[in-house]
């Protein structure tokens, strides 16, 4: 994250990440959150938050109005994921997307055993999950290309460590830095 960046955090939850970026990197910006309790938590942290439904897109924001737009564990909850990827690239000079990587080897093993995976990043049973889609590192590469987005950097994360070798199989989280 660039020092002093103007940031938009989509699905910001309690605002903890944005608060940390403000404190440690001198960032400014907004969180967008739909949940009442999370909006209150943002306000209590001193994080500027807008209570909006991402199904309606980001039409309130001009092109390139943020240095960075974050979608950290948000994409898998969105019905309009493809639209929101394009919107992320439109309103931000760059976007950072992170999501649970369904192709991580323990997930594959669960499916081979006939069960949907339940992990730290996918902590719900199939019947009560807020995730409406699952994706893989490689699937996102294809999706970004299909939507005319440039992948500036991509890697996986596993137990706090960066995974660059075989991230589709070895990483529980996929992370992409994108732009138009």
Region annotations inferred by a language model:
Residues 20-57:
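Class I SAM-dependent methyltransferase SAM/SAH-binding core
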Residues 15-19:
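Glycine-rich SAM-binding Motif I of class I
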Residues 1-4:
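Conserved alpha-helix/loop element of class I SAM-dependent methyltransferases that forms part
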Residues 11-13:
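Class I SAM-dependent methyltransferase "Motif I" SAM/SAH-binding loop
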Residues 68-79:
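A short SAM/SAH-binding and catalytic strip from SAM-dependent methyltransferases
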Residues 57-63:
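Short conserved loop adjoining the S-adenosyl-L-methionine
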Residues 82-87, 94-180:
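S-adenosyl-L-methionine-dependent methyltransferase catalytic module, highlighting the catalytic core
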């Amino acid at each position: 994250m660039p020092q002093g960046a103007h940031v938009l955090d989509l699905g910001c939850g309690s605002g903890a990440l944005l608060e940390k970026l403000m404190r440690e990197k001198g960032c400014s910006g907004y969180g967008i959150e739909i949940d009442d309790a999370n909006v209150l938590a943002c306000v209590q942290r001193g994080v500027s938050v807008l209570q909006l439904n991402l199904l309606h897109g980001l039409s309130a924001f001009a092109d390139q109005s943020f240095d960075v737009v974050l979608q950290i564990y948000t994409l898998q909850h969105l019905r309009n994921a493809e639209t929101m990827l394009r919107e992320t690239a439109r309103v931000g000079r760059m976007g950072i997307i992170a999501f649970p990587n369904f192709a991580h080897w323990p997930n594959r093993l669960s499916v081979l055993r006939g069960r949907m995976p339940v992990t730290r990043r996918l902590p719900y049973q199939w019947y009560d999950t807020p995730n409406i889609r699952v994706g893989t590192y490689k699937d996102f590469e294809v999706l970004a290309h299909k939507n005319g987005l440039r992948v500036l950097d991509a890697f996986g994360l596993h137990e706090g460590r960066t995974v660059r070798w075989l991230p589709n199989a070895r990483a529980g989280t996929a992370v992409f830095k994108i732009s138009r």
